[in-house]
Amino acid sequence: MQSLSLNSSTLQSPSMALVLIRPETETTGPSTSSRALQEVIAQLAQELTHNGQLDESSPLGKLLGKAMAASGKAGGGLEDIKAALDTLIHEKLGDNFGASADNASDTGQHDLMTQVLNGLAKSMLNDLLTKQDDGTRFSEDDMPMLKKIAEFMDDNPAQFPKPDSGSWVNELKEDNFLDGDETAQFRSALDIIGQQLGSQQNAAGGLAGDSSGGGLGSPVSNTENSPGSLGDPLIDANTGPASNSNSNGDVGQLIGELIDRGLQSVLAGGGLGTPVSTANTALVPGGEQPNQDLGQLLGGLLQKGLEATLQDAGQTGTGVQSSTAQVALLLVNMLLQSTKNQAAA
């Protein structure tokens, strides 16, 4: 019996060893993304982090929050946010996305950020509508993006005839259901905008300053007398004053170029409009105004920059084309913009 006991103990030892080893083999290893993509992910993670945790007030923040909750990482810190972003980008944009970016210059790094933002915006369009009975339903969480798409449809009635409610914006307010015909119209708009975002993703070189590059930002970068980008203040206003933003971040440069363009438009006599001009007068030395006023001011400059961009784009495209370019720019900008400041802008 003693010999049997010894043999049993011996047989159990390898089994116990396997139990101890298994957690190590199942532990997630370091990111396999290219160094350039990891830098982009780090910048985005900083923009999405508030007080050490994920800020879910933006569309991208909400999407990432759901992904982290599904993987048991809800409430995680910066490293968890980076890991979740890494996974999300490869799920949406492909396993090999960004693989060749390490050999790119600073311009290529900037282009990679643009590709990520356009690609994520495009992928989010695919998830806005969920099939239900003979139509589709949508979530209230996606209303900021849905509203911009509905406004695009209302601006192009020849392409998208008005529904019974009188406008597509009103249609979204009635309930969260679209019937078969309404779904077909909405999906048509999503396809058009998705194609624009795809084109911008593929032609991401436009942000580097080559006005012939096309895609997102090319009209904005064609500002030879521009004093330079204003950087990240708009993102600070969007994600919160305590946000850990990167002063040289590509997202800040993208939005900064639009703000620069808006400022040039205002100086040329374009005006900011009543709500923003109220905030503008508050920036007198010694005056104190809440952060919301700053968000409204910068949001107004951003809007003016978009309008100026479209005015330039109108020389090569009109109607639905220029309108599509506008809504695509807005959707990309909204990815990191908090819901509160979307309303202010």
Curated annotation (Swiss-Prot):
Compartment(s) of residence: Secreted; Host cell membrane
UniProt key word Repeat: yes
Residue stretches of each Sequence repeat: 213-219, 269-275
Region feature (2 X 7 AA repeats of G-G-G-L-G-[ST]-P): 213-275
Stretches the record annotates as Disordered: 202-247
Pfam families, per the entry: Harpin (PF04877)
GO biological process: monoatomic ion transmembrane transport; symbiont-mediated perturbation of host programmed cell death
Main location: secreted
Any one Gene Ontology cellular component term annotated for this protein: membrane
InterPro entries for the chain: HrpN/Z (IPR006961), T3SS_HrpZ (IPR054634)
Residue ranges, compositional bias (Polar residues): 219-228
Function per UniProt: Harpins are proteins able to elicit hypersensitive response (HR) in non-host plants and are required for pathogenicity in host plants. HrpZ forms ion-conducting pores permeable for cations. Such pore-forming activity may allow nutrient release and/or delivery of virulence factors during bacterial colonization of host plants.
Assembly and binders: Homomultimeric.
Protein family according to the UniProt entry: Belongs to the harpin HrpZ family.
Comment field on protein domains: The glycine-rich region is characteristic of harpins.
Name by which UniProt lists this protein: Harpin HrpZ
